[in-house]
Each structure stands twice: as C-alpha cells, then as structure tokens.
C-alpha cells in the first residue's frame, strides 16, 4: 500500500485544508488471474480481476473519525468489463462505534455472516453452478441482503460482546417492504480462541412471499494452528414450502505463516424440494511477499435440489496485493 500523508497546508481544495493536519489519503490495490470450471460440462474459464481503492480519512475537532472510500473493481472473463464498486462513508467514535452508509456494495449483518466457516480460500458451496440451466444458477444458500443504499451500525466490543445492525429501505430492496437485520457477536475473554455469533432479519423473498424471517448462528474455535466451526441458518417463510434450512462445518489448518489448508461441508434443505443439496470442498492458499496462490476443489450433489444433478468445480488463482 502506498500512502500520501498531508501535514499542514494542502494542495487539495480549500474545504479540505482545515482537516489536513489530521487527514490521510491512501491508495491500495490488487490484481488476480484465475482458471477454473463451474460444472462437469463447462469449458475451462479464465478471468482477470483488478481492484484499486482510494481512501480518505480524517478526524474532526469533536473526535469523530470520518472515512470515505471508493473502489474501482472490474473483472474480465470474456463477457464483462470494469466497473466502480464499494462506495461508502464511515463515521466512527471510540465510545459509540461505527455508522456506515454504503452507496454501493454494502453488506448487511446476515450478508456478512452467511458463511463464516474457516476456509483457506472458498466456501464449500461456492463456484459450482447448475449445468441443467446453462450454468446460470449457483448453489442454494441462505443469506441476507446486500447492495446499494445500505446503512450499518457496528458497536465497539465491551467485554468481548459487540452488537451489529443493518437497514435498507424498500426503494433500494425493490420489494414491498424494507430490509433490516441485527446480530450479536461474543468473543469471551475467559476462553481464548472462541467466537459465537447470532443474527436475524426479515426480507421479502418475492412479490408473493413476504415477511421471511432469516437467521443464522455459529461457533468457531481456534486452538494453535487449527480452527473449527459449525453454523446453522434458516429462512422461515409463511409456509412449509418457503421454509429452508442449512448447516455447515469447516476446519482449517495453518501449516505455517504462509501456507493454509481447509475442508468444509454444507447441506441445504429446501422446503419445496425433496433431495437436500450437499456440498463439500477443499481449499489451500500460499502467500509470499504480497503474492498469493489459491486453489479450491468443490463438489455438490443434487445441485439446487435436483436429484442426481451432481457437479464438480474448481478454481486456481494467482493474486497480487500492492
């Protein structure tokens, strides 16, 4: 990361000069190339991903830290080009926590906690797509809402306990109702390495399925080089057919500071479908001097609840951070 720190007078616009003694501009970036396949009948794909993030942070006379960031994030896989992404502003106070408004690319609490199982690279359900519909649909999962115009609050940790909440109005969700969720994370000070979390929210699944309660709970424990975790999630809709459940577990092992491996499993029970979707995956990553080589090899049985629709997927990526 390259940083430019301004002390005293600034060459920027006069409206920023008053904050220049306490402000910092930073630019960070990354680039990656990858090869992979999303299902058995899929041809090998290649893609390139580039990301540059501009961050401006300053402290007001009242002690608030204000940070605004804009990410230029694009990938090219033969059909898509670059784009702007992740535009946000954060207002933080040591005693009161952080309020974030994401004009683009925001994450709700459920969206960020949809799968927090330990992994060296990708989740066990990731990458795989359904060959039956032309590889346009990925594996079924339970998650919250994310996207544009999203507010989020993250409290400071008090005794290892922190509170989190998110809100997105109906104009942004595109549904009849707004979206909101909240969660609590516990990292008990008396048990080193343990983390427990619970989050719940409500959203509209479609124009006819309204008021779906979504929730997740998880526990992770790190001991030495090993981390293990277990997670359960639920979409509780107005009928049995619109009520879905999932559970997942994972274990990772840090061989050393540079090399990590992991294995995980994920099961999704769709209330409207008979066979459960069952996924498993192995990941590995090796980092040296800002360069990372990552790989994931996943397989899913009954993709999207279709019996005997079994698919394998993989991805190998080379990424650079600067």
Model-assigned labels for residue ranges:
Residues 1-322:
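Outer-membrane beta-barrel proteins
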């Amino acid at each position: 990361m390259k940083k430019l720190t301004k002390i005293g007078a600034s060459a920027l616009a006069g409206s920023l000069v008053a904050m220049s003694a306490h402000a910092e501009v930073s630019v960070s970036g990354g680039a990656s190339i990858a090869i992979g396949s999303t299902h058995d009948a899929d041809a090998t794909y290649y893609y390139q991903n580039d990301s540059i993030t501009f961050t401006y942070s300053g402290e007001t006379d009242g002690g608030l830290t204000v940070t605004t960031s804009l990410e230029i994030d694009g990938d090219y896989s033969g059909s898509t080009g670059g784009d702007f992404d992740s535009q946000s502003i954060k207002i933080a106070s040591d005693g009161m926590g952080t309020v974030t408004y994401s004009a683009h690319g925001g994450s709700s609490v459920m969206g960020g906690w949809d799968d927090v199982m330990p992994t060296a690279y990708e989740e066990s359900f990731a990458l795989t797509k359904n060959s039956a519909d032309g590889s346009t649909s990925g594996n079924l999962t339970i998650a919250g809402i994310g996207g544009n115009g999203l507010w989020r609050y993250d409290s400071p940790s008090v005794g290892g306990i922190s509170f989190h909440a998110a809100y997105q109005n109906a104009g942004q969700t595109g549904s009849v109702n707004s979206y909101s969720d909240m969660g609590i994370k516990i990292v008990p000070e008396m048990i080193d390495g343990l983390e427990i979390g619970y989050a719940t929210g409500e959203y509209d699944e479609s124009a006819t399925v309204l008021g779906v309660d979504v929730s997740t709970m998880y526990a992770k424990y790190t001991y030495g080089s090993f981390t293990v975790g277990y997670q359960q999630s639920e979409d509780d809709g107005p009928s049995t057919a619109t009520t879905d459940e999932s559970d997942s577990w994972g274990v990772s092992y840090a061989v050393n500071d540079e090399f990590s491996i992991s294995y995980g499993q994920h099961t999704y029970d769709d209330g409207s479908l008979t066979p459960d979707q069952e996924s498993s995956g192995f990941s590995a990553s090796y980092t040296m001097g800002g360069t990372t080589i990552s790989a994931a090899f996943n397989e899913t049985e009954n993709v999207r609840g279709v019996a005997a629709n079994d698919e394998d997927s993989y991805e190998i990526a080379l990424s650079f951070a600067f």
